[in-house]
């Protein structure tokens, strides 16, 4: 049996299928992998959380980076992989998407149950009162004033609602992701070459509870040896092939 057909059968039979996505899903929309380079090939250096808190200069650099990335997102959109996942959810074949991506493309494609373990670049959060703002409007304010804005509710520090290096994940978000993984009977990992803590434990948690694990990634991953099926192919093309068997 063709491997794509096998996964389609597993997906058809699953009652609690969950997908975990990483940067590889978004690179097929032309969005750079944030861990390495920007869209022009320049090396980027992320601002760590403790440095953000301590340095006004670092906060300015952080806002420049994130607002530049948000601008790049305006030239991108959901790709075939995002769209098919949204269709599978709408058809009742997929319970949720857990993602390490901060671009919000799953929601733009139509997915409604999305757990963003690293947050979203599309919102700004006050680190004091937790008030949220639209990132587009706040980036426009930042670029016009050439100054990092403060919270108009309490005067606190404002930061894009993403998880920076050294910043703790939101406990309720991690709890939701863990619960979904442990309850899954099929767990698909898409575009994640290097899962980072604590997200790297989710496929193992799913597998320990009896779930089949499927990996789709262009490069080899540390999970390949224990997965039930592995595809080193384009994510969009792989999901399209699986979807073809679902339509039969």
Q: Could you say what each language-model-derived stretch is?
A:
Residues 1-248:
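Conserved catalytic core of sirtuin-type NAD+-dependent deacylases
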């Amino acid at each position: 049996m063709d491997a794509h057909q096998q996964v389609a059968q597993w997906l058809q039979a699953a009652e609690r299928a969950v997908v975990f996505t990483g940067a590889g899903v978004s690179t097929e929309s032309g969005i750079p992998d944030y861990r390495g380079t920007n869209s022009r090939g320049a090396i980027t250096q992320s601002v760590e959380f403790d440095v953000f808190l301590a340095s006004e200069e670092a906060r300015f650099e952080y806002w420049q980076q994130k607002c530049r990335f948000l601008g790049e997102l305006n030239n991108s959109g959901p790709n075939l992989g995002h769209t098919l996942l949204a269709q599978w959810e709408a058809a009742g074949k997929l319970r949720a998407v857990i993602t390490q991506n901060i671009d919000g493309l799953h929601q733009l494609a139509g997915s409604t149950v999305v757990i963003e373990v690293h947050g979203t670049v599309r919102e700004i959060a006050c680190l004091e009162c937790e008030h949220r703002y639209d990132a587009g409007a706040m980036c426009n304010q930042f670029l016009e004033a050439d100054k990092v804005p403060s919270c108009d509710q309490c005067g606190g520090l404002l930061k894009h609602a993403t998880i920076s290096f050294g910043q703790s994940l939101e406990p309720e978000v991690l709890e939701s992701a863990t619960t979904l993984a442990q309850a899954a009977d099929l767990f698909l990992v898409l575009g994640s070459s290097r899962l980072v803590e604590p997200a790297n434990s989710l496929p193992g948690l799913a597998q320990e509870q009896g779930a089949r694990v499927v990996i789709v990634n262009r490069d080899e991953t540390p999970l390949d040896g224990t997965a039930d099926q592995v595809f080193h192919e384009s994510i969009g093309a792989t999901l399209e092939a699986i979807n073809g068997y679902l339509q039969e």
